[in-house]
Design a protein with these regions (language model features):
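Conserved catalytic-core helix/loop/strand module for nucleotide-ribose chemistry
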Residues: 1-175, 181-195
Length: 195
């Protein structure tokens, strides 16, 4: 019905959507950072050493990207992304707004010769947000192949502020569904609660 009314569903995806594809959850990345980058984390408290944003904030952008890219290169397309790709292609989904850096949904779309526009809101200027068409994939915190990733607490807080109006308009104008997003690893969840 929403498709017929011109209000396709907006899907928000988090790490849980990519877990069965082989991508780690935030707490698994934190454990990996604590193991591989101990010297980077010396200034953190024990509590901070368990926090995704705090740990990522102690890595250089190159270290962050290398850590994530290693997992993306091994990730397999899963059924969740195949289903999302099919619904996106047929217009039942307006946009997929993802917190994930991976390209699994793009790869799933390509299985059906569907190549949706993909936007990286970490680097895209706010003036273009309203021009993002339906049947697109939107990376809210950047994409692994992009120039910037929102990983640290400071980065995600700044990104949440940048996305404030875009998220408000999106949430208030379309039905939405959250898949695999816990809300615990970034400042974005406050925007959802506000709207």
């Amino acid at each position: 019905d929403n498709k017929k009314q011109g209000l396709p569903v907006i899907i928000f995806t988090g790490a849980g959507c990519s877990k069965s594809a082989g991508m780690p959850l935030a707490n698994e990345l934190v454990a990996e950072i604590n193991k591989k980058f101990k010297s980077n984390l010396r200034a953190l408290t024990d509590t901070q050493k368990k926090d995704y944003g705090s740990c990522m904030g102690k890595l250089t952008p190159h270290e962050q990207k290398t850590l994530i890219e290693k997992h993306i290169s091994k990730a397999k397309i899963n059924w969740a992304h195949i289903a999302l790709a099919s619904l996106l292609k047929e217009g039942y989904i307006g946009k997929v707004l993802t917190f994930n850096f991976d390209n699994i949904l793009n790869r799933a779309c390509s299985l059906d010769s569907f190549y949706p526009p993909t936007y990286d809101l970490k680097v895209l200027s706010e003036e273009y947000f309203s021009a993002i068409p339906n049947q697109s994939i939107v990376h809210l915190h950047g994409q692994w192949s992009g120039f910037q990733l929102a990983n640290s607490d400071i980065d995600t807080e700044q990104q949440a502020e940048k996305l404030k109006n875009f998220i408000k308009n999106t949430i208030n104008n379309s039905p939405k569904l959250f898949i695999g997003y816990s809300g615990g690893a970034d400042a974005f969840f406050e925007l959802v609660k506000e709207n």
